[in-house]
Design a protein with these regions (language model features):
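Conserved glycine-rich beta-strand-loop-beta hairpin in the small C-terminal domain of fold type I
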Residues: 368-378, 388-401
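Conserved PLP-binding active-site segment of the aspartate aminotransferase-like
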Residues: 37, 42, 323, 399-405, ...
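Conserved core of the PLP fold type I
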Residues: 138-272, 284-299, 303, 461-463
Length: 464
Protein backbone atom coordinates (compact mmCIF):
# COMPACT_ATOMS: atom_id res chain seq x y z
CA UNK A 1 0.00 0.00 0.00
CA UNK A 2 1.24 3.50 -0.78
CA UNK A 3 2.56 5.65 2.07
CA UNK A 4 0.08 8.16 3.46
CA UNK A 5 2.16 11.08 2.20
CA UNK A 6 1.97 9.61 -1.28
CA UNK A 7 -1.82 9.18 -0.98
CA UNK A 8 -2.22 12.80 0.12
CA UNK A 9 -0.16 13.97 -2.86
CA UNK A 10 -2.26 11.78 -5.19
CA UNK A 11 -5.48 13.39 -3.92
CA UNK A 12 -3.96 16.86 -4.33
CA UNK A 13 -2.83 16.02 -7.86
CA UNK A 14 -6.31 14.81 -8.81
CA UNK A 15 -7.95 17.99 -7.51
CA UNK A 16 -5.36 20.25 -9.16
CA UNK A 17 -6.00 18.48 -12.46
CA UNK A 18 -9.77 19.00 -12.15
CA UNK A 19 -9.28 22.68 -11.41
CA UNK A 20 -6.81 23.15 -14.28
CA UNK A 21 -9.13 21.41 -16.74
CA UNK A 22 -12.12 23.48 -15.53
CA UNK A 23 -13.94 20.29 -14.53
CA UNK A 24 -14.54 22.34 -11.38
CA UNK A 25 -14.53 26.13 -11.67
CA UNK A 26 -13.96 28.98 -9.20
CA UNK A 27 -16.69 29.18 -6.57
CA UNK A 28 -17.74 25.54 -6.89
CA UNK A 29 -17.98 23.56 -3.67
CA UNK A 30 -15.90 20.37 -3.64
CA UNK A 31 -17.39 17.08 -2.43
CA UNK A 32 -17.42 16.65 1.33
CA UNK A 33 -14.32 15.05 2.78
CA UNK A 34 -16.28 11.84 3.37
CA UNK A 35 -17.68 11.71 -0.17
CA UNK A 36 -14.29 12.50 -1.66
CA UNK A 37 -12.67 9.81 0.48
CA UNK A 38 -15.17 7.23 -0.76
CA UNK A 39 -14.77 8.31 -4.39
CA UNK A 40 -10.96 8.15 -4.27
CA UNK A 41 -10.83 5.14 -1.92
CA UNK A 42 -8.69 6.82 0.71
CA UNK A 43 -9.22 7.72 4.35
CA UNK A 44 -11.12 10.80 5.49
CA UNK A 45 -7.98 12.09 7.22
CA UNK A 46 -6.07 11.86 3.93
CA UNK A 47 -8.66 14.04 2.17
CA UNK A 48 -8.74 16.53 5.06
CA UNK A 49 -4.97 16.94 4.89
CA UNK A 50 -5.03 17.26 1.07
CA UNK A 51 -7.77 19.91 1.22
CA UNK A 52 -5.92 21.86 3.91
CA UNK A 53 -2.68 21.83 1.90
CA UNK A 54 -4.53 23.07 -1.19
CA UNK A 55 -5.99 25.88 0.91
CA UNK A 56 -2.43 26.78 1.90
CA UNK A 57 -1.46 26.81 -1.79
CA UNK A 58 -4.35 29.18 -2.54
CA UNK A 59 -6.23 26.77 -4.80
CA UNK A 60 -9.08 26.21 -2.33
CA UNK A 61 -10.85 28.27 0.31
CA UNK A 62 -12.37 26.88 3.49
CA UNK A 63 -15.75 28.09 4.74
CA UNK A 64 -16.43 26.83 8.28
CA UNK A 65 -19.65 24.85 8.42
CA UNK A 66 -19.98 24.90 4.64
CA UNK A 67 -16.99 23.09 3.16
CA UNK A 68 -14.15 23.65 0.72
CA UNK A 69 -14.49 25.74 -2.46
CA UNK A 70 -12.38 26.33 -5.56
CA UNK A 71 -10.58 29.66 -5.17
CA UNK A 72 -9.79 32.32 -7.81
CA UNK A 73 -9.64 31.69 -11.55
CA UNK A 74 -6.87 30.01 -13.48
CA UNK A 75 -5.07 32.61 -15.61
CA UNK A 76 -6.05 32.12 -19.28
CA UNK A 77 -3.60 29.81 -21.03
CA UNK A 78 -1.04 29.91 -18.19
CA UNK A 79 -0.18 26.37 -19.25
CA UNK A 80 2.99 26.03 -17.23
CA UNK A 81 1.01 26.81 -14.07
CA UNK A 82 -1.92 24.50 -14.77
CA UNK A 83 -2.15 21.07 -13.18
CA UNK A 84 0.09 19.61 -10.49
CA UNK A 85 3.34 21.30 -9.64
CA UNK A 86 6.13 19.40 -11.36
CA UNK A 87 9.86 19.70 -11.74
CA UNK A 88 10.38 22.09 -14.68
CA UNK A 89 12.76 19.51 -16.19
CA UNK A 90 9.80 17.17 -16.75
CA UNK A 91 7.33 19.84 -17.87
CA UNK A 92 6.45 19.03 -21.53
CA UNK A 93 6.55 22.72 -22.48
CA UNK A 94 10.00 23.16 -20.95
CA UNK A 95 11.36 20.05 -22.70
CA UNK A 96 10.02 21.29 -26.04
CA UNK A 97 11.49 24.76 -25.55
CA UNK A 98 14.94 23.42 -24.69
CA UNK A 99 15.02 21.46 -27.95
CA UNK A 100 13.56 24.24 -30.12
CA UNK A 101 15.56 27.15 -28.65
CA UNK A 102 19.00 25.53 -28.47
CA UNK A 103 21.66 26.49 -31.01
CA UNK A 104 23.56 24.20 -33.35
CA UNK A 105 26.28 23.49 -30.77
CA UNK A 106 23.81 21.85 -28.40
CA UNK A 107 23.31 18.11 -28.85
CA UNK A 108 19.68 16.98 -28.77
CA UNK A 109 19.28 13.23 -28.21
CA UNK A 110 15.99 14.01 -26.49
CA UNK A 111 14.32 15.80 -29.42
CA UNK A 112 11.70 14.23 -31.67
CA UNK A 113 12.96 14.90 -35.18
CA UNK A 114 15.68 13.82 -37.58
CA UNK A 115 18.88 15.81 -38.11
CA UNK A 116 18.47 18.36 -40.89
CA UNK A 117 20.95 16.44 -43.05
CA UNK A 118 18.64 13.39 -42.96
CA UNK A 119 15.62 15.28 -44.34
CA UNK A 120 14.60 15.32 -48.01
CA UNK A 121 16.44 18.54 -48.77
CA UNK A 122 17.14 17.74 -52.43
CA UNK A 123 13.46 17.10 -53.13
CA UNK A 124 12.39 20.27 -51.33
CA UNK A 125 14.89 22.36 -53.32
CA UNK A 126 13.63 20.88 -56.60
CA UNK A 127 10.05 21.59 -55.55
CA UNK A 128 10.86 25.19 -54.65
CA UNK A 129 12.59 25.78 -57.99
CA UNK A 130 9.58 24.37 -59.82
CA UNK A 131 7.15 26.41 -57.75
CA UNK A 132 9.10 29.61 -58.47
CA UNK A 133 8.10 29.16 -62.11
CA UNK A 134 4.41 28.61 -61.30
CA UNK A 135 1.67 31.08 -62.14
CA UNK A 136 0.60 33.83 -59.77
CA UNK A 137 -2.37 31.90 -58.35
CA UNK A 138 -0.12 29.18 -56.92
CA UNK A 139 2.15 31.74 -55.26
CA UNK A 140 -0.34 34.28 -53.94
CA UNK A 141 -3.82 32.84 -53.39
CA UNK A 142 -5.35 31.24 -50.29
CA UNK A 143 -5.80 27.50 -50.37
CA UNK A 144 -9.30 26.08 -50.80
CA UNK A 145 -11.05 25.33 -47.48
CA UNK A 146 -10.12 21.62 -47.40
CA UNK A 147 -6.69 22.25 -48.85
CA UNK A 148 -4.78 21.38 -52.02
CA UNK A 149 -6.93 18.95 -54.10
CA UNK A 150 -3.90 17.15 -55.54
CA UNK A 151 -2.37 16.48 -52.13
CA UNK A 152 -5.71 15.27 -50.78
CA UNK A 153 -6.03 12.88 -53.72
CA UNK A 154 -2.51 11.61 -53.06
CA UNK A 155 -3.30 11.08 -49.38
CA UNK A 156 -6.52 9.21 -50.20
CA UNK A 157 -4.50 6.82 -52.39
CA UNK A 158 -1.87 6.39 -49.67
CA UNK A 159 -4.52 5.71 -47.05
CA UNK A 160 -5.98 3.05 -49.35
CA UNK A 161 -2.64 1.20 -49.38
CA UNK A 162 -2.96 1.00 -45.56
CA UNK A 163 -6.47 -0.45 -45.90
CA UNK A 164 -8.23 2.82 -45.06
CA UNK A 165 -11.08 3.63 -47.44
CA UNK A 166 -11.26 7.42 -47.64
CA UNK A 167 -12.20 9.69 -50.52
CA UNK A 168 -10.33 12.98 -51.08
CA UNK A 169 -13.43 14.72 -49.67
CA UNK A 170 -12.77 12.96 -46.33
CA UNK A 171 -9.28 14.46 -46.11
CA UNK A 172 -8.72 17.91 -44.61
CA UNK A 173 -5.29 19.54 -44.84
CA UNK A 174 -3.97 21.38 -41.80
CA UNK A 175 -0.91 23.44 -40.98
CA UNK A 176 0.65 20.57 -38.96
CA UNK A 177 -0.09 17.35 -37.11
CA UNK A 178 -0.42 19.39 -33.93
CA UNK A 179 -3.01 21.66 -35.53
CA UNK A 180 -4.85 18.57 -36.72
CA UNK A 181 -5.20 17.29 -33.14
CA UNK A 182 -6.06 20.79 -31.91
CA UNK A 183 -8.91 21.05 -34.42
CA UNK A 184 -10.24 17.63 -33.43
CA UNK A 185 -10.14 18.63 -29.76
CA UNK A 186 -11.95 21.91 -30.50
CA UNK A 187 -14.53 19.98 -32.53
CA UNK A 188 -15.29 17.18 -30.07
CA UNK A 189 -14.36 18.32 -26.56
CA UNK A 190 -15.70 20.65 -23.91
CA UNK A 191 -13.69 21.81 -20.87
CA UNK A 192 -13.96 19.16 -18.18
CA UNK A 193 -14.36 16.23 -20.61
CA UNK A 194 -12.09 13.25 -20.03
CA UNK A 195 -9.47 12.15 -22.55
CA UNK A 196 -7.48 8.91 -22.40
CA UNK A 197 -3.83 8.82 -23.42
CA UNK A 198 -1.20 6.12 -23.31
CA UNK A 199 1.12 6.16 -20.33
CA UNK A 200 3.72 7.00 -21.52
CA UNK A 201 2.68 9.04 -24.56
CA UNK A 202 4.02 11.89 -26.72
CA UNK A 203 4.58 14.72 -24.26
CA UNK A 204 2.98 17.44 -26.37
CA UNK A 205 -0.34 15.58 -26.08
CA UNK A 206 -0.21 16.58 -22.39
CA UNK A 207 0.55 20.22 -23.22
CA UNK A 208 -2.15 20.44 -25.90
CA UNK A 209 -4.79 18.83 -23.71
CA UNK A 210 -3.94 21.27 -20.92
CA UNK A 211 -4.80 24.07 -23.31
CA UNK A 212 -8.22 22.52 -23.85
CA UNK A 213 -8.79 22.24 -20.09
CA UNK A 214 -9.83 18.64 -20.15
CA UNK A 215 -9.26 15.88 -17.61
CA UNK A 216 -6.52 13.51 -18.80
CA UNK A 217 -6.30 9.87 -17.71
CA UNK A 218 -3.29 7.71 -18.58
CA UNK A 219 -3.61 4.04 -19.55
CA UNK A 220 -0.49 1.89 -19.07
CA UNK A 221 1.11 0.87 -22.34
CA UNK A 222 2.51 -2.56 -23.21
CA UNK A 223 4.73 -3.69 -26.12
CA UNK A 224 1.52 -4.72 -27.96
CA UNK A 225 -0.54 -1.59 -27.23
CA UNK A 226 -2.58 -0.27 -24.29
CA UNK A 227 -3.24 -2.53 -21.30
CA UNK A 228 -6.80 -3.54 -22.17
CA UNK A 229 -7.88 -4.33 -18.61
CA UNK A 230 -6.75 -0.86 -17.51
CA UNK A 231 -8.36 0.64 -20.62
CA UNK A 232 -11.68 -1.03 -19.83
CA UNK A 233 -11.47 0.12 -16.21
CA UNK A 234 -10.78 3.70 -17.33
CA UNK A 235 -13.83 3.61 -19.62
CA UNK A 236 -16.02 2.50 -16.73
CA UNK A 237 -14.57 4.94 -14.19
CA UNK A 238 -14.25 8.10 -16.29
CA UNK A 239 -16.62 7.88 -19.31
CA UNK A 240 -14.00 9.50 -21.59
CA UNK A 241 -14.92 11.28 -24.79
CA UNK A 242 -11.65 10.73 -26.66
CA UNK A 243 -8.55 8.50 -26.79
CA UNK A 244 -5.37 9.76 -28.50
CA UNK A 245 -2.68 7.26 -29.51
CA UNK A 246 -0.01 6.18 -32.01
CA UNK A 247 -0.79 2.71 -33.38
CA UNK A 248 2.10 2.56 -35.83
CA UNK A 249 5.45 3.45 -34.28
CA UNK A 250 4.57 4.56 -30.77
CA UNK A 251 6.10 7.68 -29.27
CA UNK A 252 8.07 7.38 -26.98
CA UNK A 253 8.36 3.58 -26.75
CA UNK A 254 8.69 2.53 -30.40
CA UNK A 255 6.13 -0.24 -29.77
CA UNK A 256 3.70 -1.43 -32.45
CA UNK A 257 0.01 -2.19 -31.91
CA UNK A 258 -0.83 -5.89 -32.33
CA UNK A 259 -3.86 -6.92 -34.45
CA UNK A 260 -5.44 -8.74 -31.48
CA UNK A 261 -5.18 -5.70 -29.21
CA UNK A 262 -6.47 -3.46 -32.03
CA UNK A 263 -9.64 -5.53 -32.47
CA UNK A 264 -10.34 -5.76 -28.74
CA UNK A 265 -9.63 -2.05 -28.31
CA UNK A 266 -12.15 -1.12 -30.99
CA UNK A 267 -14.81 -3.34 -29.41
CA UNK A 268 -14.31 -1.58 -26.08
CA UNK A 269 -14.41 1.83 -27.79
CA UNK A 270 -17.59 0.96 -29.68
CA UNK A 271 -19.34 -0.21 -26.52
CA UNK A 272 -18.37 2.99 -24.69
CA UNK A 273 -19.06 5.41 -27.56
CA UNK A 274 -15.40 6.47 -27.50
CA UNK A 275 -13.79 8.41 -30.37
CA UNK A 276 -10.16 7.52 -31.18
CA UNK A 277 -7.57 9.86 -32.68
CA UNK A 278 -4.83 7.86 -34.38
CA UNK A 279 -1.65 9.91 -34.83
CA UNK A 280 0.21 8.34 -37.77
CA UNK A 281 3.07 10.76 -38.37
CA UNK A 282 5.75 8.04 -38.31
CA UNK A 283 4.21 5.85 -41.05
CA UNK A 284 7.05 6.39 -43.54
CA UNK A 285 9.60 5.02 -41.05
CA UNK A 286 7.98 1.58 -40.89
CA UNK A 287 9.90 -1.36 -42.32
CA UNK A 288 6.72 -3.48 -42.28
CA UNK A 289 3.19 -2.09 -41.95
CA UNK A 290 1.57 -2.17 -38.51
CA UNK A 291 -2.20 -2.52 -37.99
CA UNK A 292 -4.15 0.71 -38.26
CA UNK A 293 -7.21 1.30 -36.11
CA UNK A 294 -8.65 3.45 -38.90
CA UNK A 295 -8.42 0.49 -41.29
CA UNK A 296 -10.23 -1.90 -38.94
CA UNK A 297 -12.83 0.74 -38.07
CA UNK A 298 -13.40 2.27 -41.51
CA UNK A 299 -13.18 5.82 -40.13
CA UNK A 300 -16.39 5.29 -38.19
CA UNK A 301 -15.21 6.35 -34.75
CA UNK A 302 -11.48 6.63 -35.58
CA UNK A 303 -9.97 9.86 -36.88
CA UNK A 304 -6.51 9.58 -38.41
CA UNK A 305 -4.06 12.45 -38.50
CA UNK A 306 -0.57 12.83 -39.93
CA UNK A 307 2.02 15.29 -41.20
CA UNK A 308 5.20 15.57 -43.23
CA UNK A 309 7.44 17.34 -40.72
CA UNK A 310 9.34 14.17 -39.75
CA UNK A 311 10.39 13.14 -43.25
CA UNK A 312 10.21 16.06 -45.71
CA UNK A 313 10.77 19.28 -43.75
CA UNK A 314 9.74 20.64 -40.36
CA UNK A 315 9.69 24.12 -41.92
CA UNK A 316 6.88 23.11 -44.29
CA UNK A 317 3.92 23.14 -41.94
CA UNK A 318 1.52 20.68 -43.51
CA UNK A 319 -0.60 17.94 -41.96
CA UNK A 320 -3.94 16.26 -42.51
CA UNK A 321 -7.07 14.82 -40.91
CA UNK A 322 -8.96 11.84 -42.36
CA UNK A 323 -12.44 11.32 -40.90
CA UNK A 324 -16.00 10.38 -41.80
CA UNK A 325 -17.68 12.91 -44.13
CA UNK A 326 -19.92 14.59 -41.54
CA UNK A 327 -16.96 15.24 -39.28
CA UNK A 328 -14.73 16.43 -42.12
CA UNK A 329 -17.37 18.99 -43.03
CA UNK A 330 -17.59 20.30 -39.47
CA UNK A 331 -13.81 20.31 -39.08
CA UNK A 332 -13.49 22.31 -42.31
CA UNK A 333 -15.81 24.98 -40.92
CA UNK A 334 -13.77 25.05 -37.72
CA UNK A 335 -10.54 25.38 -39.70
CA UNK A 336 -11.96 28.39 -41.56
CA UNK A 337 -13.06 29.94 -38.27
CA UNK A 338 -9.64 29.53 -36.65
CA UNK A 339 -7.24 29.66 -39.62
CA UNK A 340 -9.23 30.97 -42.57
CA UNK A 341 -7.79 29.74 -45.89
CA UNK A 342 -4.63 28.04 -44.76
CA UNK A 343 -1.32 27.89 -46.59
CA UNK A 344 -1.02 26.92 -50.24
CA UNK A 345 2.74 27.05 -50.78
CA UNK A 346 3.55 24.41 -48.18
CA UNK A 347 1.10 21.92 -49.66
CA UNK A 348 2.44 22.56 -53.17
CA UNK A 349 6.01 21.91 -52.06
CA UNK A 350 5.08 18.81 -50.04
CA UNK A 351 3.13 17.26 -52.92
CA UNK A 352 5.97 17.92 -55.35
CA UNK A 353 8.53 16.45 -52.94
CA UNK A 354 6.69 13.26 -51.98
CA UNK A 355 5.71 12.47 -55.59
CA UNK A 356 9.31 13.07 -56.68
CA UNK A 357 10.95 9.89 -57.99
CA UNK A 358 13.69 10.25 -55.38
CA UNK A 359 11.47 10.28 -52.27
CA UNK A 360 10.97 6.52 -52.03
CA UNK A 361 14.71 5.87 -52.33
CA UNK A 362 15.41 8.63 -49.81
CA UNK A 363 13.13 6.98 -47.25
CA UNK A 364 14.70 3.57 -47.88
CA UNK A 365 18.06 5.13 -47.05
CA UNK A 366 16.65 6.80 -43.91
CA UNK A 367 15.22 3.50 -42.68
CA UNK A 368 18.58 1.77 -43.13
CA UNK A 369 20.37 4.59 -41.32
CA UNK A 370 17.88 4.42 -38.46
CA UNK A 371 18.43 0.67 -38.07
CA UNK A 372 22.19 1.24 -37.89
CA UNK A 373 21.77 4.14 -35.46
CA UNK A 374 19.43 2.04 -33.29
CA UNK A 375 21.97 -0.78 -33.01
CA UNK A 376 24.74 1.68 -32.19
CA UNK A 377 22.69 3.52 -29.55
CA UNK A 378 21.60 0.30 -27.83
CA UNK A 379 25.24 -0.81 -27.60
CA UNK A 380 26.52 2.54 -26.31
CA UNK A 381 23.75 2.85 -23.73
CA UNK A 382 24.36 -0.69 -22.50
CA UNK A 383 27.91 0.27 -21.50
CA UNK A 384 26.33 2.81 -19.12
CA UNK A 385 23.85 0.30 -17.70
CA UNK A 386 20.94 1.93 -19.56
CA UNK A 387 18.50 -0.66 -20.92
CA UNK A 388 15.72 -0.28 -23.52
CA UNK A 389 12.14 -1.18 -22.59
CA UNK A 390 12.01 -2.87 -26.00
CA UNK A 391 14.24 -2.68 -29.08
CA UNK A 392 11.79 -1.27 -31.66
CA UNK A 393 11.28 -2.76 -35.11
CA UNK A 394 11.62 0.66 -36.71
CA UNK A 395 11.63 4.39 -36.06
CA UNK A 396 13.91 6.75 -34.18
CA UNK A 397 12.95 6.29 -30.52
CA UNK A 398 14.38 4.21 -27.68
CA UNK A 399 12.55 4.24 -24.34
CA UNK A 400 15.22 3.41 -21.80
CA UNK A 401 15.50 2.77 -18.08
CA UNK A 402 18.37 4.28 -16.15
CA UNK A 403 20.49 2.11 -13.85
CA UNK A 404 19.81 1.83 -10.11
CA UNK A 405 16.63 3.91 -10.27
CA UNK A 406 18.51 7.11 -11.16
CA UNK A 407 16.39 10.26 -11.33
CA UNK A 408 15.98 11.09 -15.02
CA UNK A 409 15.04 14.72 -14.31
CA UNK A 410 18.22 15.26 -12.28
CA UNK A 411 20.30 13.58 -14.99
CA UNK A 412 18.65 15.78 -17.65
CA UNK A 413 19.38 18.96 -15.69
CA UNK A 414 23.03 17.96 -15.27
CA UNK A 415 23.41 17.11 -18.96
CA UNK A 416 21.80 20.40 -20.03
CA UNK A 417 24.60 22.25 -18.23
CA UNK A 418 27.01 20.45 -20.57
CA UNK A 419 25.04 21.22 -23.73
CA UNK A 420 23.05 17.99 -24.08
CA UNK A 421 19.22 18.10 -24.14
CA UNK A 422 17.52 14.94 -22.86
CA UNK A 423 13.85 13.97 -22.55
CA UNK A 424 13.03 12.71 -19.02
CA UNK A 425 10.44 9.97 -18.69
CA UNK A 426 7.92 11.81 -16.53
CA UNK A 427 7.41 14.39 -19.28
CA UNK A 428 5.67 11.53 -21.11
CA UNK A 429 3.88 9.94 -18.15
CA UNK A 430 0.50 11.15 -16.92
CA UNK A 431 0.95 9.11 -13.73
CA UNK A 432 4.53 10.36 -13.17
CA UNK A 433 5.60 6.70 -13.03
CA UNK A 434 8.57 6.98 -15.42
CA UNK A 435 10.99 8.92 -13.23
CA UNK A 436 13.90 6.64 -14.11
CA UNK A 437 13.31 6.60 -17.89
CA UNK A 438 14.66 8.69 -20.77
CA UNK A 439 13.59 8.80 -24.40
CA UNK A 440 16.48 8.74 -26.86
CA UNK A 441 16.30 9.74 -30.52
CA UNK A 442 18.85 7.39 -32.09
CA UNK A 443 19.33 9.61 -35.15
CA UNK A 444 20.38 12.44 -32.82
CA UNK A 445 22.52 10.18 -30.57
CA UNK A 446 25.54 9.53 -32.77
CA UNK A 447 28.00 11.91 -31.09
CA UNK A 448 30.36 10.30 -28.57
CA UNK A 449 30.14 13.42 -26.38
CA UNK A 450 26.51 12.60 -25.55
CA UNK A 451 27.55 9.41 -23.80
CA UNK A 452 30.50 11.05 -22.07
CA UNK A 453 28.20 13.73 -20.63
CA UNK A 454 25.60 11.11 -19.72
CA UNK A 455 28.19 8.96 -17.93
CA UNK A 456 29.33 11.98 -15.93
CA UNK A 457 25.75 12.85 -14.96
CA UNK A 458 24.99 9.28 -13.90
CA UNK A 459 28.16 9.16 -11.82
CA UNK A 460 27.17 12.38 -10.07
CA UNK A 461 23.67 11.02 -9.47
CA UNK A 462 25.11 7.86 -7.86
CA UNK A 463 27.34 9.89 -5.54
CA UNK A 464 24.41 12.12 -4.65
Amino acid sequence: MARKGTRIEAVMSEIRSRIASRAVVPGVRLPSVRAQAEALRVSVSTVVEAYERLVAEGLLTSRPGSGFYVAGPVAPLALAEMGPKVDRAVDPLWVSRQSLESDARVLKPGCGWLPASWMYEAGVRRALRSLARADTVELAEYATPQGHPGLRQFLARRLATAGIDASPEQVLLTESGTQAIDLVCRFLLEPGDTVLVDDPCYFNFHALLKAHRVHVVGVPNTPQGPDLDAFDAALAAHAPRLYITNSGIHNPTGAVLSPLVAHRLLKLADRAGLVIVEDDIFADFETSPAPRLAAFDGLSRVIQIGSFSKTVSASLRCGYIAAKPAWTDGLTDLKIATNFGGGRLGAEVVLSAITDSGYRKHMETVRVRLTEAMDQAVHRLATLGITPWIVPQAGMFLWCRLPDGADAAAVARACLQDGVVLAPGNAFSQSASAGDYLRFNVAQSREARIFEVLAKALSTAERG
